[in-house]
């Protein structure tokens, strides 16, 4: 496992437990178990519930296993994409669960651990894979895709509305790109100096987000899973999703709104408290939405 020393702080734990309402004898599916922070909080809050935790990142799963070892009789961890959660449950002989949790985005380990390529703060290989067994890396995408396709990805997935074409052009001009700082350099060269000064966040944030989403098929996977999530829940079971940018939040909002089997519990997304943001700045962009599976034949 790569070197890593920073503690992961799960986001909006109080709100997750409030909306998920875990109870004894109930089964919770943690679709993005990550380093195990939310699962641990749920298990501590509910001494009789059980967690099935899944993640595509084998490295964070090892961290979760260590963090949750005292609950080993009530937690089962699997290296599986949440889009395949229905097949996993079937394999385990579980027809439905009582709660589903999704904490989308990048974990602290993925950002701060060495050589994952998610960060623009230091030089690392251009990887960005959450599943290290996947063949598609950021380096492959940036060096092989046509300029027009790169511009589309940066425009759509990074919401880089004004400068996507300029950034894509600089990426192509700077090929081959091998490290995260190579990508930062290309973005810096593409943006006017006034735009770099104007931005509140790092000027390469949107481009890094776009490439990461594309490499990991994040939006496609989210859409695919949410379509079937309602059928994985027992009546009265709840789904709680924390997203970190508007693209994810829009998918969650529209899926909940269009479902005939879910009752929306959060008319507007719940945001973290000011106190939590002070203690954990990563929580700032978090948006939580929740819904409940209605009874069969219910309104």
Swiss-Prot record:
Composition-biased stretches (Basic and acidic residues): 269-282, 289-299
Provide one Gene Ontology cellular component: cytoplasm
Q: Which domain of life is it from?
A: Bacteria
Which residues are connected by disulfide bridges in this protein? none
- This protein's record includes keyword Transferase: yes
- EC numbers listed for it are 2.1.1.199
Q: Does the keyword Methyltransferase apply?
A: yes
Residues that bind S-adenosyl-L-methionine, according to the entry?
A: 36-38, 55, 82, 103, 110
State where it is primarily located.
Answer: cytoplasm
Enzyme class (EC, first level) = transferase
Stretches the record annotates as Disordered: 269-299
Q: Provide a GO biological process annotation.
A: rRNA base methylation
InterPro entries for the chain: RsmH (IPR002903), SAM-dep_MeTrfase_MraW_recog (IPR023397), SAM-dependent_MTases_sf (IPR029063)
One GO MF annotation is: rRNA (cytosine-N4-)-methyltransferase activity
Localization in the cell: Cytoplasm
Q: Which PANTHER family match?
A: 12S RRNA N4-METHYLCYTIDINE METHYLTRANSFERASE, S-ADENOSYL-METHYLTRANSFERASE MRAW
> Member of which family?
Belongs to the methyltransferase superfamily. RsmH family.
General function of this protein: Specifically methylates the N4 position of cytidine in position 1402 (C1402) of 16S rRNA.
Recorded protein name is Ribosomal RNA small subunit methyltransferase H
What is the organism field in this record?
A: Thermotoga maritima (strain ATCC 43589 / DSM 3109 / JCM 10099 / NBRC 100826 / MSB8)
Q: Which gene encodes it?
A: rsmH
């Amino acid at each position: 496992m790569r070197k890593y020393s920073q503690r992961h702080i799960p986001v909006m734990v109080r709100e997750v437990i409030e909306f998920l309402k875990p109870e004894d004898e109930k089964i919770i599916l943690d679709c993005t178990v990550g380093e195990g922070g939310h699962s641990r909080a749920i298990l501590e809050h509910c001494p009789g519930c059980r967690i099935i935790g899944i993640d595509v990142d084998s490295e964070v799963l090892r961290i979760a296993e260590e963090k949750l070892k005292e609950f080993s009789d009530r937690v089962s961890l699997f290296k599986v994409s949440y889009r395949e959660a229905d097949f996993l449950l079937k394999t385990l002989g579980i027809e439905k669960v009582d709660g589903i949790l999704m904490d989308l985005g990048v974990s602290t380990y993925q950002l701060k651990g060495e050589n994952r390529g998610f960060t623009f703060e230091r030089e690392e290989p251009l990887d960005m894979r959450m599943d290290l067994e996947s063949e598609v890396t950021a380096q492959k995408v940036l060096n092989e895709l046509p300029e027009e396709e790169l511009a589309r990805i940066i425009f759509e997935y990074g919401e880089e509305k004004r400068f996507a074409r300029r950034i894509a052009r600089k990426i192509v001009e700077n090929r081959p790109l091998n490290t995260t700082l190579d990508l930062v350099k290309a973005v810096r060269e593409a943006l006017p100096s006034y735009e770099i000064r104007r931005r509140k966040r790092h000027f390469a944030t949107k481009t890094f987000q776009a490439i990461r989403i594309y490499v990991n098929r994040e939006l496609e996977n989210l859409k695919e899973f949410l379509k079937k999530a309602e059928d994985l829940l027992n009546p009265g079971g709840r789904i709680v999703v924390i997203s970190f940018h508007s693209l994810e939040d829009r998918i969650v909002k529209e899926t909940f709104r269009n479902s005939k089997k879910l009752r929306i519990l959060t008319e507007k997304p719940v945001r973290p408290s000011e106190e939590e943001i002070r203690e954990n700045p990563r929580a700032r962009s978090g948006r939580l939405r929740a819904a409940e599976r209605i009874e069969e034949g219910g309104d």
